[in-house]
A protein has these predicted regions:
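A helix-coil-helix interface module used to build multimeric assemblies
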Residues: 1-202
């Protein structure tokens, strides 16, 4: 088995390792696109402060876009002996660009990189959820207006309590979703923060 980048000179309990990181490679496949996006932003910054030449940036961005396209089609694979998504992306770059490919890690902790990937992934998933909730909300509002004159009884537990309508029943669910959107918005704001520099040295 290949030596892991985080491994030190002592034996790790295999059961603990399996429980904590045993499925990392499988889960890393979901992060491939976001790892590439994080690297694209990082190398753009490196070029802006003079740590990469413009020609190097252009070549790295071109190759990263190719890797992104592979990941976007669901064809990204972490090869045997490669530890994780970060190492696989670097391997693909060095296969095409040689030592230049290793420059994507300049000034960046791998733990920082993990946090960036997770935040970008979570941000994308939250947006997908919000878009789906918006579609459902609009449908409920449409039904609420459509059936506003269709009467039905309102209940307290199992006892008829007040006159109501089918439209009001739909509207109640729509209002519940509006409250949920506030939580999703808060989650998005918390996720949409740059973690770079926070994951090393503590």
């Amino acid at each position: 088995m290949a030596h892991k980048l985080w491994e030190k000179n002592f034996e790790v309990n295999k059961e603990i390792e399996r429980f904590t990181v045993g499925r990392d490679r499988e889960l890393d496949l979901y992060l491939a696109k976001y790892d590439v996006l994080g690297s694209m932003a990082h190398i753009t910054m490196l070029e802006s402060i003079g740590l990469l030449e413009k020609s190097e940036l252009d070549q790295l961005l071109a190759e990263l876009k190719q890797i992104y396209a592979i990941a976007d089609k669901g064809e990204f694979v972490i090869e045997d002996g490669v530890e994780d998504v970060h190492s696989q992306v670097e391997l693909m770059l060095t296969q095409k660009l040689g030592e230049m490919g290793k420059k994507i890690h300049s000034g960046r902790s791998r733990n920082d990189q993990v946090l960036v990937d997770l935040k970008l992934f979570t941000r994308h998933e939250l947006k997908e959820i919000v878009d789906s909730v918006k579609i459902l909300f609009d449908e409920l509002i449409q039904k609420s207006n459509q059936y506003k004159d269709v009467l039905m009884p309102g209940y307290t537990h199992l006892q008829v309590a007040m006159p109501s309508s089918f439209g009001l029943w739909f509207g109640a669910y729509a209002e519940g979703l509006a409250d949920d959107m506030l939580f999703l918005q808060a989650a998005y704001c918390m996720t949409n923060r740059n973690p770079l520099g926070s994951a090393a040295g503590y």
